[in-house]
Swiss-Prot record:
Entry keyword set: Aminoacyl-tRNA synthetase, ATP-binding, Cytoplasm, Ligase, Metal-binding, Nucleotide-binding, Protein biosynthesis, Zinc
Co-factor: note: Binds 1 zinc ion per subunit.
Entry protein name: Cysteine--tRNA ligase
EC numbers: 6.1.1.16
Gene3D superfamilies to which the protein is assigned, alphabetical: Cysteine-tRNA ligase, C-terminal anti-codon recognition domain (1.20.120.1910), HUPs (3.40.50.620)
Location of the protein in the cell: Cytoplasm
Gene it is expressed from: cysS
Catalysed reactions, semicolon-separated: tRNA(Cys) + L-cysteine + ATP = L-cysteinyl-tRNA(Cys) + AMP + diphosphate
PANTHER family assigned: CYSTEINE--TRNA LIGASE, CYTOPLASMIC (PTHR10890:SF3), CYSTEINYL-TRNA SYNTHETASE (PTHR10890)
Organism: Bartonella bacilliformis (strain ATCC 35685 / KC583 / Herrer 020/F12,63)
GO biological process: cysteinyl-tRNA aminoacylation
Amino acid sequence: MGNLRFYNTLTRKKEDFIPIDSSKVRLYVCGPTVYDYAHIGNARPVIVFDILFRLLRHVYGKDHVIYARNVTDVDDKINARAIREYPKLTLNDAIHQLTERTYDQFQQDTEALGCLLPTYQPRATDHLEEMRSLIERLLEKGHAYIAENHVLFSVNSIKNNPLYGVFAKRSLNEMKAGARVDVAPYKRDDMDFVLWKPSTQQEPGWKSPAGISVLGRPGWHIECSAMSMAKLLTPYGGGLACDDLSVNVFDIHGGGIDLIFPHHENEIAQSCSVFGTERMANFWMHNGFLQVEGRKMSKSFGNFITIRSILESNFVEFSNAMTDDLKQSWAGLSARFSMLQTHYREPLNWTAQRLAQSSSELYRWYELLRCERSCLDNGGVIDASLISTLSDDLNTPNSFTLLRKFYKEENAVALVQGMDLFGLLRQEWVREIECPLFVKGIDLDSKFIDQRIAERLLFIQNKEWAAADEIRNELAKKGIALKDEKDSQTGERITTWEVK
């Protein structure tokens, strides 16, 4: 087995990853709320944890990793959007239309981004019984209470638990000041949060737990506790019925850094209180924030970008022979390529230039593979240095340095295996001779770049420095960085280039 080390948000340090059971490595990631098109901020955790899923499958075997990513299909934002978009339908029918349409679109978008399907994609509305069971257990143990047909989690019931608040690195007073809590007279404490709430006659509702007579719907946090239990604990060891506490803990929980508080803090409180464990998951991994052109992404700033808009944009000049499906697949892999050049825990600045440059570099990689089509038939052994680098807390920037090295060395076999590991390979684009070229234009022609470098070297020999600098600047604007050095054998000046 490979030596995997990941940064654990729970301990704030990198640790060796040792699964509870290497024959069933278990990963849970918070997924979409299906009320609107997914944006590029949503795309980042989808891509990041797809890379983790691929690495775990490589190390432990494809059949020995369980990846669950939930779908939230009950939410007040869903209700409001459904009423607005389907005013002529009943609310339940409108919600069904909206959530099905949005879910299908999310599936198409993530496929275009090169992501594998998770093992499970549980929907909240399919796991209401598990939610009710968890809530009733919390009531029995004194960690929850009923008030005005709501069920609320009592934070004071576990305030002596050393884990509560440690995850978010906040004191109770800090969390009270910073949390977006509903001001409600029925709460015993401002920090208490909703496990279940009543529905009006106009809102969707289901049978409530603990004999509450009115219909209701779950709170946000209980959904993930229930769905992770259903898919990672119950089939594995019996979930609630199992006395072995270690079985009621899974290996990795992932999500965006914005979910640390209150969502993940409250998930931990719920699950640990039900199962009597000190941990919900042994590792917590979080991806960093995403900005657009140096600013927070916001509709008010005019920089709100959906995955769909990227897939349908002409950010490079495409070949006329390309179909719309092929263009969208190319755009999706270019976006994936672009995101993976930043370490998952670091902030990511999304720019149009960065996307175009990623497309340019990816295109050249495919040029090499298409010239060496036999690379597809040379076994499936991935370069050990690539696995070692990725195993160090998913270090994709250093991994891409190795992929660029393979490209420069024209090592098509190592490059194709690396691209496959990172979800960047479409074998049919390499194998099919008649597959149309993906992009066109002199900007992406390596022969043109080599020609301009030769012209620049001639200008340097003639001491025409301004003309030489003009070529360097011209290529820099296209994302091409030049590096001047001396040949170790002849001492002559040589110039190499790479995409930045």
